[in-house]
């Protein structure tokens, strides 16, 4: 069975960016394991389950899976995960990743081994793309020269204030686009497109929540996974 590891933030993951790929992969009979930095259950960003923000259907779906999914409620510690055990590693986004996953040494190791090694593939979504700015391979940035998309500055401007404070009062540590560009990535968030998913070798990146479904389908294609046969 094809296996996947979801590395999810304890400081606020964006619901759709985790739940859409997770449920899609499971519907295609992939085995899913969830890891968090400390092994505590991940925390959903409340803005991503606000019906006024994301719509009632999405909000209800995310809450239902968040509350009842066995792996989300009993994750493994990130330090115990090894890339060789999985065919793909998924890094859902959310501003919370900037405080834990993106700067976690074990997350960087997993990403590096999946993308630069032979252990599998990686799907990195939205703010989690910032992880690429902190991941090095042979002394250089892993993302150097690679085509990527991610959460753009233009969108961030509509969320934080002039002091980079978020609606919940936290100060954003950095802007994803700025950091990933500084790591010499070939950045294009395709702002004129409805969705944005980019494939560069074993690295798949997705722009944001609206690209989550396409990102999941792209990962399935890259893994050569076909839809399960009807009973």
Regions found by a protein language model. Give the residues of each.
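Short, thiol/selenol-centered motifs that function as redox-active sites or metal-ligating centers
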Residues: 124-128
């Amino acid at each position: 069975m094809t296996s996947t590891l979801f590395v999810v933030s304890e400081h606020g993951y964006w619901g759709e960016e985790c739940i859409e790929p997770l449920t899609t992969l499971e519907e295609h009979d992939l085995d899913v394991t969830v890891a968090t930095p400390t092994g505590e259950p991940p925390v959903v960003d409340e803005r991503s389950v606000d019906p006024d923000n994301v719509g009632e259907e999405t909000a209800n779906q995310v809450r239902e899976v968040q509350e009842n999914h066995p792996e989300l409620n009993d994750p493994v510690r990130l330090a115990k995960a090894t890339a060789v055990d999985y065919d793909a590693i998924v890094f859902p986004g959310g501003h919370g990743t900037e405080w834990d996953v993106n700067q976690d040494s074990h997350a960087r190791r997993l990403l590096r081994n999946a993308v630069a090694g032979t252990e599998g593939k990686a799907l990195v979504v939205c703010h989690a793309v910032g992880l690429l700015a902190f991941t090095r391979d042979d002394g250089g940035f892993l993302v150097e020269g690679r085509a990527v998309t991610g959460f753009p500055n233009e969108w961030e401007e509509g969320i934080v204030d002039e002091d980079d404070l978020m609606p919940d009062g936290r100060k954003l540590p950095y802007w994803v686009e700025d950091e990933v560009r500084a790591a010499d990535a070939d950045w294009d968030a395709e702002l004129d497109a409805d969705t944005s998913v980019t494939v560069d070798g074993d690295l798949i990146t997705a722009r944001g929540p609206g690209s989550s479904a396409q990102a999941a389908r792209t990962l399935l294609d890259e893994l050569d996974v076909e839809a399960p046969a009807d009973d």
